[in-house]
């Protein structure tokens, strides 16, 4: 019965369904939504706007669905990086090809384990496969990449909708599965699509218990030492070991890797996005060293590699071939420590795979709850006694490592770094990183670095040569006077698309400045990520384009061989005709053009305000 006392009874079904979806998202802990304009998703847009007006959501409008999905991915990454909360951001779009445009971000989120919700509007079931306009089969469009999918529209019952939304949020967050990633909610909406009545948004209670939260390492240890955990993993402090840390977004795993390296005197072979590359045990130029680079006290890099007896692997190490070769060796005892149900072990050589929580629970040491600080303090002093190893069930190796084991690695890495010739592009990339590490921001928000220090700016690197320039040229951590902020890259599938848009999401969600370092091809892929609707707030984003006229990553691979040169320029270098300065200016970004290190250093010392692009001409 319709009556003024029951406003909902006057409302159309599409609007009621959209409001139920939005209310359920808010109560499940969702905070940020990226909206791409469209007709079929209009009911969702109205409901989201009302919820934002009521203070429950933060919205950003991005016209391109491909870019919008990457912006949402960046926002999700920001929450995990800065807040330790696996809170999925949402990308909302209309039906048809708009949904397919989210696929690149979805597969990156799948491979990287980033929470993400794709909320697509759809036509009613009756219109599918009839030739109706802007209608395709959207259910299952992302295939095996999603952790959960639901088709909403058969009922407007708020309880049924809330049930599906909560499941989607929990699945995206990895709350129960330890497998965070993308989910797809497909909402079927029939006209009328505009609301008939204003929505008086009810009191909603956002709950974070649907979201996975990162637990501080000290609280996890709860009096147990990192050495005891290491021994429980089957690692032996008396044998020569190395810790490999690939792309990693979990600060607690980074803390553990750094603490064990300190306690046992093991070197860290850490990628720039590992969160431990600036640790005192991190080895400079480790990849070149493993490939047989310049020597050290007691042997060259290849000799050091042959002396490794055991490996602890953390994160997703895919950046360099020498690390891949190291992880493929059958003569090294390897342990993978992960925080997810999926782990990296490309060659299948891992003897043991576990989470930190599982390792701690299996110890079951009496009195382990005596206090987290005791465990942390013991390891700070290098507690790696044989008795602790024996007590954790690990034997002591016959060949105790020399106390110089770490020093040999650090010295060899430094010698390799000193001997490495630096290209102009690499010099520009390293200059950008150095300036970013010294950047002072007026922002009130800061990011907690894995070593417990704070920084106010994030560096986003494209997954091509730029991240490799950093990997090859960053100094050892012990040489740093100030701890830089985190380095982020889309290393899930290591693609170059979406880099700028992801950085927009990082800057939007964190409220902090973000600097992007990117090559010309990767920039051309995602230059429209700089587009901003006139109604949207600015983000503090600076994009440094290292323009060496094409993709130079292939020149260092087998495709760059002289006998294949007839193919190389057209099919691999693929230089583009793009005037980055004019294009960025057309999108409303401030533009600078430079061609030398001095000019770059001067520009990088300025405050990052609004959107800007620096075109660095290398050729």
What are these regions (language model features)?
Residues 31-32, 77-93, 99-101, 108-115, ...:
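Structural signature of the thiamine diphosphate
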Residues 69, 77-81, 101, 228-231, ...:
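Glycine-rich, anion-gripping cofactor-binding loops and their flanking helix/strand elements
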Residues 108, 115, 119, 126-139, ...:
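Thiamine diphosphate
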Residues 1-28, 162-235, 401:
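Cofactor-/ligand-binding subdomain signature composed of acidic, glycine-rich
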Residues 14-107:
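N-terminal cofactor/phosphate-binding cores enriched in small/glycine residues
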Residues 120-164, 168, 270-371, 379-386, ...:
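Glycine-rich, acidic loop regions that bind phosphate or pyrophosphate groups
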């Amino acid at each position: 019965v319709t009556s003024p006392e029951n406003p909902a009874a006057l409302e159309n079904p599409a609007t009621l369904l959209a409001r139920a979806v939005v209310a359920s998202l808010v109560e499940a802990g969702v905070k940020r939504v990226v909206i791409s304009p469209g007709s079929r998703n209009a009911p969702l847009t109205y409901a989201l706007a009302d919820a934002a007006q009521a203070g429950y959501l933060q919205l950003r409008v991005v016209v391109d669905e491909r870019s919008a999905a990457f912006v949402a991915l960046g926002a999700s990454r920001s929450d995990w990086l800065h807040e330790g909360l696996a809170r999925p951001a949402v990308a909302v779009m209309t039906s048809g090809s708009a949904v397919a445009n989210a696929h690149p971000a979805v597969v990156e989120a799948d491979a990287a384990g980033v929470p993400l919700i794709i909320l697509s509007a759809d036509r009613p079931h009756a219109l599918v496969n009839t030739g109706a306009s802007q209608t395709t089969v959207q259910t299952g469009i992302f295939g095996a990449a999603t952790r959960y999918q639901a088709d909403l529209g058969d009922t407007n019952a708020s309880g049924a909708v809330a049930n599906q939304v909560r499941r989607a949020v929990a699945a995206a967050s990895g709350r129960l599965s330890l497998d965070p990633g993308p989910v797809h909610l497909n909402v079927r909406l029939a006209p009328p699509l505009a609301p008939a009545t204003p929505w008086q948004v009810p009191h909603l209670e956002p709950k974070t218990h649907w979201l996975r939260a990162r637990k501080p390492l000290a609280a996890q240890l709860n009096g147990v030492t990192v050495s005891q955990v290491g021994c429980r993993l089957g690692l032996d402090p008396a044998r020569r070991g190395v810790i490999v840390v690939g792309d990693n977004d979990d600060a607690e795993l980074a803390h553990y890797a750094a603490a064990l390296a300190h306690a046992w005197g093991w070197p860290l072979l850490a990628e720039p996005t590992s969160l431990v590359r600036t640790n005192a045990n991190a080895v400079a130029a480790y990849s070149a060293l493993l490939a047989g680079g310049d020597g050290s006290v007691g042997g060259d890099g290849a000799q050091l590699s042959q002396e490794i007896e055991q490996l602890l692997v953390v994160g997703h190490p895919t950046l360099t071939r020498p690390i891949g070769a190291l992880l493929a060796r059958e003569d090294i005892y390897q342990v993978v420590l992960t925080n997810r149900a999926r782990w990296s072990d490309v060659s299948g050589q891992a003897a043991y795979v576990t989470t930190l929580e599982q390792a701690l629970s299996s110890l079951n040491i009496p009195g382990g709850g005596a206090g987290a600080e005791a465990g942390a303090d013991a390891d700070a002093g290098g507690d790696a006694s044989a008795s602790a190893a024996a007590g954790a069930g690990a034997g002591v190796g016959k060949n105790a490592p020399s106390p110089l084991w770490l020093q040999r690695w650090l010295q060899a890495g430094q010698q390799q770094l000193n001997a490495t010739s630096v290209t102009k592009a690499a010099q520009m990339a390293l200059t950008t990183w150095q300036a970013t590490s010294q950047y002072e921001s007026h922002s009130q928000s800061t990011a907690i670095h894995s070593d417990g220090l704070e920084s106010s700016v994030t560096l986003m690197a494209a997954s091509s040569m730029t991240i490799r320039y950093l990997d090859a040229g960053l100094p050892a951590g012990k040489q740093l006077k100030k701890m830089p902020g985190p380095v982020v890259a889309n290393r899930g599938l290591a693609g170059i698309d979406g880099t700028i848009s992801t950085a927009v999401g990082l800057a939007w969600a964190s409220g902090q400045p973000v600097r992007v370092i990117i090559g010309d091809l990767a920039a051309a892929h995602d230059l429209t990520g700089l587009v901003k609707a006139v109604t949207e707030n600015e983000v503090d984003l600076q994009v440094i384009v290292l323009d060496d006229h094409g993709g130079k990553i292939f020149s260092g691979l087998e495709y760059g061989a002289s006998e294949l040169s007839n193919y190389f320029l057209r099919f691999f270098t693929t230089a583009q005709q793009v005037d980055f300065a004019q294009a960025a200016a057309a999108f409303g970004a401030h533009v600078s053009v430079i061609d030398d290190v001095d000019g770059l250093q001067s520009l990088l010392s300025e405050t990052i305000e609004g959107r800007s692009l620096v075109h660095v001409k290398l050729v």
